[in-house]
């Protein structure tokens, strides 16, 4: 090689990357003239390398490697569905050799393998009333699920229904005509709100407020107990405070009255007082003028009471208003470096209480959630620093506050999971038709989240790890009830697959049937937990527990209708449903607020029995009363003992479990019989002697049998109920039979009551109908049993502060019955 060739090779240089790409001459400057002219970035990188050919047998090696990994995946999970691009190549089924029509069919088939058809459509349920109002419920609500149960029962019914035959031409049945549907909430416009209210005395108010803190405060932490009791003490002492705390105290008393049992002499007709406070807040409180944390607490308290009384639409409205106030105040952001320690902790608790309630109400109503998790930049709450020297804070509340915070944090985590999967399992949009398709990867993802939460739950929050009947045991059961209810909502779109074959040739459940089986197992677990709660003498009457049982019993009844071909399986489902109904009756028999939901469950079970064609013995109802402790109160009503505790069970009534109460021996026997879909009971009806007796938990002498829904009318409890009933057992133009007063030997009679069933309160608040005081000392429920310290026990001086009515017979000179003129009430 000559020296000229060597020098020529040395003069060869690398052009800049841009000139090399554009294949133009480069002057090799930094930057070059071309890059300067065109305003390019002049870079000198590594020279481009040509792609080399793959090594020999490289494709065969990848195929063997893929086959080995597929074998490992199938061994770990036989039901694992791998993506279509991992399938082995096949020349016959290659997309290249297929026509466009076959190619589109195969793509649809492969995409449908990863999607399951949901039980619900994307439309939900829109109810149009006669007055022009509309009420919409989404697919995740229990209203739509109950509509599906009705349609399935009517489809499988062996009993002819004249109403159904006459309406067979209509494609969409009227949900208000179903006798066992939960009635649609309505506005209480006919209720005239009070202009002024009377607050109870301080000791009585302290006991009532403590009921809320001891029952429901571990699931929603609304208040800071120390500051609340201090402001309450100053309010009663001076009578001067800001207007917001006045409404906050009224709202808290409204919630506290819902937990007052009838054994407590401190609350005469607590439900009437609660409703008066509720209407007072709705008519007098205006939150648009100012945004404070107290306003959020008031709206949240009113939303809780709306849930207690099954006003779901109003609860959704108040919760969204509270969430709007949180956005205006910036409670969803972390400002701990600006706020004080007390303000930061209170803002966290209030915001997450609103978040938990917003997730829950939006799910059970089926309406959109007003906040996304990506918008939340707020840390989880922590405990407050209590001052034990503060006499206004009950000592038991301090212990309850410290131990229940972990339950509240776990409740927040469950609410986050709930808000995530509702959008995936109950989609609003569907690309093809009205039927929704649920993605299998989305179901697997959220199923793993639920499983991870349950496996990592601390042992001291599981009922099997804590002492039985302890407060921690009750909290653990209630937390698991919340978890099982979320499982029911998660697996419910696949419940229609319960009738498909459960096992395939490999012995493992198929996916839709597996999800349906898990839904049924969660419902049975809820019944077991309710059975355990019914054994406890101090079970809190939470609306979370009632709605969990409500969803579980609907699921079990629906499973029983779907498995009619398998008698053993169907009988097992319906037996568990009856057991759960009796457990709910034992827990909520003293609460009037829950009578509407209990009535809906009872009518659902009766409708199933009326349409059942089996020969099983339905008279054998589950007996769980013998499992209660001896000291458990088995009262059946919240009406004071002065009034007769009468049920509407009679020997001539349509079901064999009815009986004639002793106090109504003089009852007329020619009262009209209730109707069933246009026919009376004396007409022939299949299996009319085989129905089980579903007793009413809260039935009063003025109640009517709610069997057939005709044209509906709104009542004061906010629900639509029929206005055409046959009075049982007395006509409403007569008085009720006499009863013996506990303070007089003279028989007295009730006056005829106005014609609306299940009015709240059950009797009007008047001095002639208030019970006599049992003693001069007023104590909170359970104070004598547990040794509850001050201020749960009312001092003897309290007898001069409580207003008692006069006796009906006019004898008001008893020393144990002070006159109402000496009462001191705070307005």
Curated annotation (Swiss-Prot):
UniProt-recorded Gene Ontology molecular function terms: DNA-binding transcription factor activity, RNA polymerase II-specific; RNA polymerase II cis-regulatory region sequence-specific DNA binding; sequence-specific DNA binding; zinc ion binding
Modified-residue entries (Phosphoserine), positions: 112
UniProt family annotation: Belongs to the ASG1 family.
Location of the region described as Disordered in the Swiss-Prot/TrEMBL record: 80-114, 158-193, 794-827
Compositional bias of kind Low complexity: 159-179, 811-827
Native organism taxonomy: Eukaryota, Fungi, Dikarya, Ascomycota, Taphrinomycotina
Gene3D superfamilies linked: Zn(2)-C6 fungal-type DNA-binding domain (4.10.240.10)
GO biological process, one term: DNA-templated transcription
Coiled coil: none
Keywords: Cytoplasm, DNA-binding, Metal-binding, Nucleus, Phosphoprotein, Transcription, Transcription regulation, Zinc
UniProt DNA-binding residue ranges: 16-42
Entry protein name: Putative transcriptional regulatory protein C16G5.16
SUPFAM superfamilies to which the protein is assigned, alphabetical: Zn2/Cys6 DNA-binding domain
Source superkingdom: Eukaryota
Subcellular location: Cytoplasm; Nucleus
Species of the source: Schizosaccharomyces pombe (strain 972 / ATCC 24843)
């Amino acid at each position: 090689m000559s020296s000229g060739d060597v020098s020529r090779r040395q003069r060869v240089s690398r052009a800049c990357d841009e000139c090399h790409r554009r294949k133009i001459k480069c002057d090799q400057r930094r930057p070059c003239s071309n890059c300067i002219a065109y305003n390019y970035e002049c870079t000198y990188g590594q020279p481009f390398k040509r792609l080399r050919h793959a090594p020999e047998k490289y494709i065969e090696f990848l195929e063997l490697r893929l086959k080995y990994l597929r074998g490992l995946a199938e061994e770990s999970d036989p039901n694992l569905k791998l993506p279509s691009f991992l399938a082995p190549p096949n020349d016959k089924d290659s997309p290249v050799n297929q026509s466009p029509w076959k190619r589109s069919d195969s793509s649809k088939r492969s995409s449908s393998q990863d999607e399951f058809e949901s039980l619900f459509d994307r439309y939900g349920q829109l109810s149009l009333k006669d007055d022009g109002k509309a009420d919409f419920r989404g697919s995740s609500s229990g209203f739509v699920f109950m509509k599906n149960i009705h349609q399935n029962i009517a489809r499988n019914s062996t009993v002819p229904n004249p109403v159904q035959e006459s309406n067979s031409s209509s494609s969409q049945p009227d949900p208000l005509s179903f006798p066992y549907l939960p009635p649609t909430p309505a506005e209480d416009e006919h209720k005239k709100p009070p202009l002024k209210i009377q607050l109870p005395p301080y000791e009585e108010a302290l006991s009532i407020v403590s009921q809320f803190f001891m029952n429901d405060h571990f699931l929603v932490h609304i208040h800071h107990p120390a500051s609340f009791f201090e402001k309450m003490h100053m309010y009663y002492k001076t009578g001067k405070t800001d207007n917001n705390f006045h409404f906050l105290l009224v709202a808290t008393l409204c919630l506290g009255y819902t937990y007052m049992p009838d054994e407590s002499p401190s609350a005469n007709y607590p439900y009437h007082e609660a409703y008066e406070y509720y209407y007072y807040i709705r008519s007098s409180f205006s939150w648009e003028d100012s945004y404070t944390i107290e306003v959020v607490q008031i709206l949240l308290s009113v939303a809780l009471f709306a849930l207690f009384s099954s006003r779901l639409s109003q609860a959704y409205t108040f919760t969204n208003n509270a969430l709007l106030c949180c956005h205006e105040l910036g409670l969803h952001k972390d400002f701990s470096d600006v706020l004080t320690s007390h303000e930061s902790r209170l803002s966290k608790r209030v915001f997450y209480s609103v978040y938990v309630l917003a997730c829950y109400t939006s799910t059970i109503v089926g309406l959109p959630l007003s906040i996304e998790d990506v918008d939340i930049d707020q840390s989880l709450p922590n405990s407050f620093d209590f001052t034990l020297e503060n006499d206004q804070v009950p000592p038991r509340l301090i212990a309850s506050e410290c131990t229940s915070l972990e339950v509240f944090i776990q409740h927040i985590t469950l609410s986050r999971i709930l808000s995530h999967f509702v959008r995936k399992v109950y989609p609003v949009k569907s690309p093809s038709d009205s039927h929704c398709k649920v993605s299998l990867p989305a179901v697997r993802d959220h199923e793993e989240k639920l499983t991870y939460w349950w496996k990592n739950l601390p042992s001291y929050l599981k009922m099997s790890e804590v002492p039985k009947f302890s407060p921690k045991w009750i909290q653990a059961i209630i937390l698991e009830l919340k978890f099982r209810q979320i499982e029911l909502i998660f697996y419910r779109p696949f419940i229609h697959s319960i009738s498909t074959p459960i096992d395939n040739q490999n012995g493992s459940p198929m996916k839709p049937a597996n999800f349906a089986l898990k839904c049924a197992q969660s419902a049975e677990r809820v019944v077991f937990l309710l059975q355990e709660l019914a054994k406890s003498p101090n079970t809190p009457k939470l609306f979370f527990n009632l709605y969990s049982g409500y969803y579980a019993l609907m699921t079990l009844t629906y499973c029983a209708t779907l498995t009619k071909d398998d008698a053993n399986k169907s009988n097992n489902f319906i037996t568990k449903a009856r057991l759960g109904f009796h457990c709910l009756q034992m827990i909520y028999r003293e609460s009037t607020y829950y009578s509407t939901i209990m009535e809906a469950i009872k009518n659902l079970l009766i409708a199933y029995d009326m349409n059942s064609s089996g020969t099983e013995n339905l008279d054998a109802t589950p007996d769980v009363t013998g499992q209660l402790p001896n000291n458990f109160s088995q009262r059946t009503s919240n009406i004071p003992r002065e009034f007769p505790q009468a049920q509407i069970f009679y020997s001539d009534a349509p079901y064999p479990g009815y009986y004639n109460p002793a106090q109504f021996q003089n009852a007329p026997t020619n009262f009209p019989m209730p109707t069933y879909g246009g026919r009376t009971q004396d007409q022939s009806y299949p299996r009319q002697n085989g129905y089980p007796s579903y007793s009413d938990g809260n039935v009063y002498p003025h109640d009517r049998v709610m069997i057939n829904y005709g044209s509906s009318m709104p009542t004061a409890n906010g629900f639509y109920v029929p206005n055409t009933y046959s009075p049982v057992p007395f006509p409403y133009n007569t008085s009720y039979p006499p009863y013996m007063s506990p303070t007089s030997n003279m028989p007295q009679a009730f006056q005829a009551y106005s014609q609306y069933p299940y009015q709240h309160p059950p009797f009007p608040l008047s001095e002639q109908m208030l019970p006599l005081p049992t003693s001069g000392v007023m104590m909170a429920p359970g104070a004598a049993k547990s040794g509850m310290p001050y201020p749960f026990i009312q001092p003897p001086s309290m007898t001069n502060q409580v207003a008692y009515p006069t006796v009906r017979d006019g004898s008001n000179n008893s020393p144990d019955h002070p006159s109402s003129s000496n009462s001191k009430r705070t307005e």
